[in-house]
């Protein structure tokens, strides 16, 4: 693609994790039986009136603040009119003319460096019913009316890697703010990708192709790379690029045409008369506070001297970060090494997340404290961590029951060192010429005979003291 550049814009649909729907009191439960969490408002019964969800508005303000946006001080809603069975009232309530947030940006990082992605707008709207296509088309209205925020970027993204980084940053922000589960595989974060190509140096946009409802990072990357190659090939062979709506097919790893657009669809937007304009006071907006954002968390971890590889894992998984942050231990660098080496590794071996192991943070704190006080060894720490899964008892009792207490008593260690020396006098006499070999041999035997329970540092001190006195 040396002679062309990709122009990419992304529309993200983010389902909010409110308890009830956008304009009705119906509860949101994605595990509920089909068509059981609906009421007359969701089904568009005549005479029903929408009731705006305040929690969804607060979520919109949080996201607008996180994305450095101008927040509209007056809430307006509009009707997007179309006839389709996924919204039985014949229109979707959205924000067309006055979105809750506009003119924002977010910074992303790729292998090529940092880039600022400008965002045109975010607006609140309701989701549609879920459709299941088979021999018959089935509709589940449980999803109809679920609160959404649509995030519309400007067409400033220029590669698949940038697109993935941008969507991932939005996901991480949503998780940090606790406004959405942002699980692409469950459809709570979906991306529509708009792609066009143009010769480098040209300012005019090429013909845009839209790829709908992409729900994984791999699919985003593959779909964009495939579509770029396809459009480039068409340009080079003078084949026209049509304005089309496509979907990405995982099996063929290609984009497939759903429909060709012959013109702009007129949705006949007009103000939603059943929801009055709602003024948002400065006090109301200022009272909406943000949690620590991904880049703020990353900065804090760097100050705590946590390694980059651990920072990446923590900032990519907000629940993991919350679990890690809840462990009360001053040396965060040391904690991170122990946490990832033992807790995260254990979780990976069980194919679960670390916070799903049900290890109490207080138990981890106590166990690390025992390690610091040399009551247990590093080897014992490794053995204890798996025992803490679903553990509900006394840590001191646990380590005694499993014989994991480290032996640091100087008198006991002195006795054991003397026993090893007495049994290996011939080798020990070589200490003055081959000190390293003798020390390694004696310490190795101590660890072997007493099951690695001896404090190695203390054993080394005692051994050197005895040998230096013996051969001075």
Swiss-Prot record:
Record-level GO BP terms: glutaminyl-tRNAGln biosynthesis via transamidation; translation
Transmembrane spans: none
Pfam families (UniProt xref): GatB_N (PF02934), GatB_Yqey (PF02637)
UniProt enzyme class: ligase
EC numbers for this chain: 6.3.5.-
Catalytic activity: L-glutamyl-tRNA(Gln) + L-glutamine + ATP + H2O = L-glutaminyl-tRNA(Gln) + L-glutamate + ADP + phosphate + H(+); L-aspartyl-tRNA(Asn) + L-glutamine + ATP + H2O = L-asparaginyl-tRNA(Asn) + L-glutamate + ADP + phosphate + 2 H(+)
InterPro entries assigned to the protein according to its UniProt record, in alphabetical order: Asn/Gln-tRNA_amidoTrfase_suB/E, Asn/Gln-tRNA_Trfase_suB/E_cat, Asn/Gln_amidotransferase, Asn/Gln_tRNA_amidoTrase-B-like, GatB, GatB_Yqey_C_2, Gln-tRNA_amidoTrfase_suB_CS, Gln_synth/guanido_kin_cat_dom
GO molecular function per UniProt: asparaginyl-tRNA synthase (glutamine-hydrolyzing) activity; ATP binding; glutaminyl-tRNA synthase (glutamine-hydrolyzing) activity
UniProt keyword list: ATP-binding, Ligase, Nucleotide-binding, Protein biosynthesis
Subunit structure: Heterotrimer of A, B and C subunits.
Family of the protein in this entry: Belongs to the GatB/GatE family. GatB subfamily.
Known function: Allows the formation of correctly charged Asn-tRNA(Asn) or Gln-tRNA(Gln) through the transamidation of misacylated Asp-tRNA(Asn) or Glu-tRNA(Gln) in organisms which lack either or both of asparaginyl-tRNA or glutaminyl-tRNA synthetases. The reaction takes place in the presence of glutamine and ATP through an activated phospho-Asp-tRNA(Asn) or phospho-Glu-tRNA(Gln).
Protein's recorded name: Aspartyl/glutamyl-tRNA(Asn/Gln) amidotransferase subunit B
Organism phylogeny: Bacteria, Bacillati, Mycoplasmatota, Mycoplasmoidales, Metamycoplasmataceae
């Amino acid at each position: 693609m040396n002679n062309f550049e990709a122009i990419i814009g992304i529309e993200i649909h983010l389902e909010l994790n409110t308890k009830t729907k956008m304009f009705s009191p119906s509860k949101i439960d994605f595990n509920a039986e089909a068509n059981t969490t609906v009421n007359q408002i969701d089904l568009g019964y005549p005479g029903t009136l929408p009731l705006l969800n305040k929690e969804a508005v607060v979520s919109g303000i949080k996201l607008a603040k996180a994305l450095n946006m101008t927040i509209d001080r007056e809430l307006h809603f509009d009707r997007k009119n179309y006839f389709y069975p996924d919204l039985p009232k014949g229109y979707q309530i959205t924000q067309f003319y006055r979105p809750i947030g506009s003119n924002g940006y977010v910074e992303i990082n790729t292998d090529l460096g940092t880039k600022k992605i400008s965002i045109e707008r975010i607006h609140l709207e309701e989701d549609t019913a879920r459709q299941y296509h088979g021999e018959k088309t089935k509709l589940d209205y449980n999803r109809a009316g679920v609160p959404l925020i649509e995030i519309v970027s400007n067409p400033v993204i220029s590669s698949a890697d940038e697109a993935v980084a941008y969507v991932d940053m939005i996901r991480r922000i949503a998780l940090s703010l606790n406004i959405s589960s942002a699980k692409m595989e469950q459809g709570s974060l979906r991306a529509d990708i708009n792609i066009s190509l143009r010769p480098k140096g040209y300012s005019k946009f090429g013909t845009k192709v839209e790829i709908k409802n992409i729900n994984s990072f791999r699919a985003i990357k593959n779909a964009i790379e495939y579509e770029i190659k396809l459009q480039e090939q068409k340009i080079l062979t003078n084949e026209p690029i049509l304005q089309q709506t496509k979907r990405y097919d995982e099996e063929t790893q290609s984009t497939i045409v759903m429909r060709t657009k012959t013109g702009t669809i007129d949705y006949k937007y007009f103000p939603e008369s059943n929801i009055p304009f709602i003024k948002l006071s400065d006090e109301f907006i200022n009272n909406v506070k943000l949690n620590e954002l991904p880049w703020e968390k990353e900065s804090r971890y760097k100050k705590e001297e946590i390694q980059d590889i651990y920072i990446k894992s923590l900032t990519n998984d907000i629940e993991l970060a919350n679990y890690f942050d809840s462990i009360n231990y001053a040396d965060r660098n040391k904690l991170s090494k122990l946490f990832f080496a033992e807790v995260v590794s254990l979780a990976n071996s069980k194919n679960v997340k670390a916070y799903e192991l049900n290890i109490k943070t207080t138990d981890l704190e106590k166990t690390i404290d025992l390690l610091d006080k040399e009551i247990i060894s590093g080897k014992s720490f490794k053995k204890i961590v798996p025992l803490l899964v679903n553990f509900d008892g006394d840590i001191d009792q646990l380590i005694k029951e499993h014989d994991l207490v480290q032996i640091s008593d100087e008198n006991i260690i002195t006795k054991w060192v003397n026993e090893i020396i007495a049994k290996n006098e011939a080798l020990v006499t070589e200490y003055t010429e081959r000190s390293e070999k003798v020390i390694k041999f004696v310490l190795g035997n101590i660890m072997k005979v007493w099951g690695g329970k001896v404090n190695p540092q203390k054993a080394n001190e005692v051994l050197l003291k005895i040998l230096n006195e013996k051969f001075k």
